[in-house]
Regions:
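Secondary-structure boundary/capping micro-motif
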Residues: 1-284, 288-289, 295-299, 303-305, ...
Length: 350
């Protein structure tokens, strides 16, 4: 009712209000006579987009500035500043003087420089370090057009026989090296690439090195990785680094899961349990090399799997692809009696 806009056209014959507008919904949007010439009244139309913009504008304006009159603010400021300089804490000053302001608001006003006192006058606040406000990088929405999980499912329907690979990133120490993992869904085979940092540029560089390594074996990246499915981590945002070959021609399809939906790539998530059985959460990868990562995943892929009737993921991969491609990915054969599935494996790292 508040956001209805009055419109007139060539059919309007009077300035009077239509009787139908005196009751709900108070607008002409659903009226069958809205576009008919036999309605002589001005039209009152509700525009949802305009109403939403007005609502958001009011919402922002209502939260701007200080919710006190000029006199109230200066009175509060004088009392608080005087009390703090006398050695009282802020909460005590507020309650002792029955001020209609919260402790959080006072701290925020001090932080903004509205008071004559500063953080240096607050013994405890001066000791506190500012909170880290670092925000993780994510894949821009525009990049995901045509690459959403819905698009992925449609692509699988059109190409039911195609094999796809799930990708993820395993975090070690926050801010340190990470491992970008690849899970071949059809054979439960996993390998990883060690990244110096969790950025799109670093991921793109490692992918290019992998493509060059496969090319040296006479294999195109797109032949082994026709379809990739990953999450919304910022390290995957350079989509063309994954999709295009060394000749810059498209050879791979990259798709993204919906935000906060790890269950859409369950195979790589489940296989990470084998990884975490060896490497505990929070373990730093900073001293690791790519050879260490290769050794780790070689042991993981050597584990016998029930779903393969006692065969290992390595056995299945070399049968479906080849030993040469496994070598190119850095994964080697480990005899069953030598397989280690605990943290003891880390002692073999050089």
């Amino acid at each position: 009712k508040l956001h209805g806009k009055v419109h007139t056209n060539g059919f309007t014959k009077t300035d009077e209000c239509c009787p139908r507008l005196l009751k709900a919904p108070f607008v002409c949007n659903g009226c069958p006579k809205r576009n008919h010439s036999n309605c002589p009244y001005p039209r009152r139309i509700y525009h949802a987009k305009t109403a939403q913009q007005e609502y958001e504008s009011v919402l922002v304006e209502s939260r701007e500035g200080i919710p006190l009159t000029k006199e109230e603010f200066y009175k509060t400021e004088a009392i608080i500043s005087s009390a703090v300089k006398s050695g009282q804490n802020i909460y005590h000053a507020i309650k002792a003087n029955d001020l209609s302001v919260s402790k959080t608001t006072v701290y925020r006003h001090i932080e903004c420089g509205y008071y004559t006192i500063s953080k240096i006058d607050l013994p405890r606040a001066a000791k506190f370090k500012p909170r880290k406000g670092q925000k993780g990088e994510y894949v821009p929405k525009g990049v995901k057009i045509g690459r959403s999980f819905e698009d992925f499912m449609l692509y699988l329907e059109e190409n039911p026989s195609i094999n796809y690979v799930e990708m993820d990133t395993v975090i070690g120490r926050i801010g340190g090296k990470v491992i970008m993992t690849f899970q071949f869904v059809n054979v439960d085979f996993m390998f990883g690439l060690l990244l110096d940092n969790k950025t799109a540029a670093e991921a793109a560089e490692k992918i290019r090195e992998l493509k060059e390594r496969l090319c040296a074996f006479g294999v195109k990246f797109g032949d082994v990785f026709p379809v990739l499915l990953t999450d919304n981590g910022g390290e995957f945002s350079d989509v063309f680094a994954f999709e295009n070959g060394l000749d810059e021609e498209p050879e791979t399809k990259l798709f993204f899961c919906d935000p906060n939906a790890p269950y859409q790539k369950p195979h790589v998530e489940n296989n990470h349990t084998l990884f975490r059985g060896i490497v505990g959460t929070g373990t730093s990868f900073d001293d690791w090399s790519q050879e260490n990562v290769n050794l780790l995943f070689s042991h993981i892929n050597a584990v016998k799997r029930k779903q393969f009737n006692g065969k290992s993921a390595y056995d299945m991969f070399t049968f479906a692809y080849s030993k040469e491609i496994a070598d190119a990915l850095g994964i080697s054969f480990v005899a069953p009696k030598d397989v280690i599935q605990t943290s003891k494996l880390l002692k073999l790292f050089s």
